[in-house]
Amino acid sequence: MTAKNVGLPSTNAKLRGFIDQNFSPSKGNISLVAFPVSSTNSPTKILPKTLGPINVNVGPQMIISTPQRIANSGSVLIGNPYTPAPAMVTQTHIAEAAGWVPSDRKRAREFIDSDFSESKRSKKGDKNGKGLRHFSMKVCEKVQRKGTTSYNEVADELVSEFTNSNNHLAADSAYDQENIRRRVYDALNVLMAMNIISSLPTGKKRNQVDCNSAQECQNLEIEKQRRIERIKQKRAQLQELLLQQIAFKNLVQRNRQNEQQNQGPPAVNSTIQLPFIIINTSRKTVIDCSISSDKFEYLFNFDNTFEIHDDIEVLKRMGMSFGLESGKCSLEDLKIARSLVPKALEGYITDISTGPSWLNQGLLLNSTQSVSNLDPTTGATVPQSSVNQGLCLDAEVALATGQLPASNSHQSSSAASHFSESRGETPCSFNDEDEEDEEEDPSSPE
């Protein structure tokens, strides 16, 4: 669409003249073209300063260009409001120019963003994951492989690896030898702070993970062995208490039968009240006995060895426990002994009748022997024959060697001032260590 009448205002706001000219594709010097602008808010248009101040109201959709003679008569000059350079379009395509084509040039902000992203990508590409995390992993692998090594040894190996052309590092890489050694030093400090590796007095680094695992495993095995020994001790105490109950109840039944046969209680001088102790010594022994006024304290002085037996030991020797402590109990006696204890404890009586071997029943002797073979202080192994020899000892010798805690009441000792501990192994006379063990292990048979 072309305009026929054009008015050019002068500086004094008067119309200078009119030009009436019919524009055709072949003639004409000046062409004014108006085309619709999109509905979006377009920025403010800046008119050329060559026209001077203009008082005529011109709409934002009109673009006025200065009159110029165009070499090609079939073309018009159209100014693009978003590009500083004019564009040449033919007159036949004016009707199709409903909008403008954005320029291919990027804005300054786009250039900044693209440059920043490219530089960021280039930095990331240069780093190639070779940060402190990467070096820490490499250092940890080196220390784990060697077990014990030094800083210089690890740094030299990593420098030789990363400076090699086969490891994707160029000669001008930022990770030169000094940088690699610095990162190795930082990685070692981080790993030591995390207790993954430890430093030795000689300056060497040791893989603490493997050392801690081995030490923890050794500590667990020692703790397992200690608990197995506690279980054996608890079983020995349970056995002693059950034998006491069986002996007392069997004695009560025998006295009841004697009263029925004799049709009355025995004479006063023919009975011994429980509890009691028996002191046995040689006839040539000189005994000095002192008794307190209330007859609650007795002081004996012997010039020779003597034996002391309590009532439980005497009852066992009389056969009141049916020979359960030695494993020589018949089926009939075993049936009677099971009837003298609560039903929940009958299974223990059956186990006790098998002899002292029931103390180790259900315990992993193989694992305990393997643990006992290992010296926790030096890590050296003890010969297997010495361990098996210790397990074959009787209860009293095993108690002395510390391998098998058991009661001393099975055999009487001829040592001076030696008391039988069969009655002493009651819950009331446990030492402080046993009381602590009971608090830790509430599921014990007691």
UniProtKB/Swiss-Prot annotation:
UniProt keyword list: Acetylation, Activator, Cell cycle, DNA-binding, Nucleus, Phosphoprotein, Transcription, Transcription regulation
Coiled coil: none
Span list, region DCB2: 274-330
Pfam family, one: DP
N-acetylthreonine sites (modified residues): T2
GO cellular component: nuclear envelope; nucleoplasm; transcription regulator complex
DNA-binding region(s), chain positions: 129-210
Motif (Nuclear localization signal): 103-118
Low complexity bias (residue ranges): 406-419
Subcellular location field: Nucleus
Short sequence motif named DEF box, residue ranges: 176-210
Region (Disordered): 404-446
Tissue: Expressed in all tissues examined. Highest levels in spleen and heart.
Tree of life domain: Eukaryota
GO MF term set: DNA binding; DNA-binding transcription factor activity
Modified residue annotations for Phosphoserine: S24, S42, S122
Compositionally skewed regions (Acidic residues) per UniProt: 431-446
PANTHER family found in the cross-reference section: TRANSCRIPTION FACTOR DP, TRANSCRIPTION FACTOR DP-2
Subunit structure: Component of the DRTF1/E2F transcription factor complex. Forms heterodimers with E2F family members. The complex can interact with hypophosphorylated retinoblastoma protein RB1 and related proteins (RBL1 and RBL2) that inhibit the E2F transactivation domain. During the cell cycle, RB becomes phosphorylated in mid-to-late G1 phase, detaches from the DRTF1/E2F complex rendering E2F transcriptionally active. Interacts with GMCL. Component of the DREAM complex (also named LINC complex) at least composed of E2F4, E2F5, LIN9, LIN37, LIN52, LIN54, MYBL1, MYBL2, RBL1, RBL2, RBBP4, TFDP1 and TFDP2.
Summary of the function given for this chain in its UniProt record: Can stimulate E2F-dependent transcription. Binds DNA cooperatively with E2F family members through the E2 recognition site, 5'-TTTC[CG]CGC-3', found in the promoter region of a number of genes whose products are involved in cell cycle regulation or in DNA replication. The TFDP2:E2F complex functions in the control of cell-cycle progression from G1 to S phase. The E2F1:DP complex appears to mediate both cell proliferation and apoptosis. Blocks adipocyte differentiation by repressing CEBPA binding to its target gene promoters.
Family membership noted in the UniProt record: Belongs to the E2F/DP family.
Stated name of the protein: Transcription factor Dp-2
Organism: Mus musculus (Mouse)
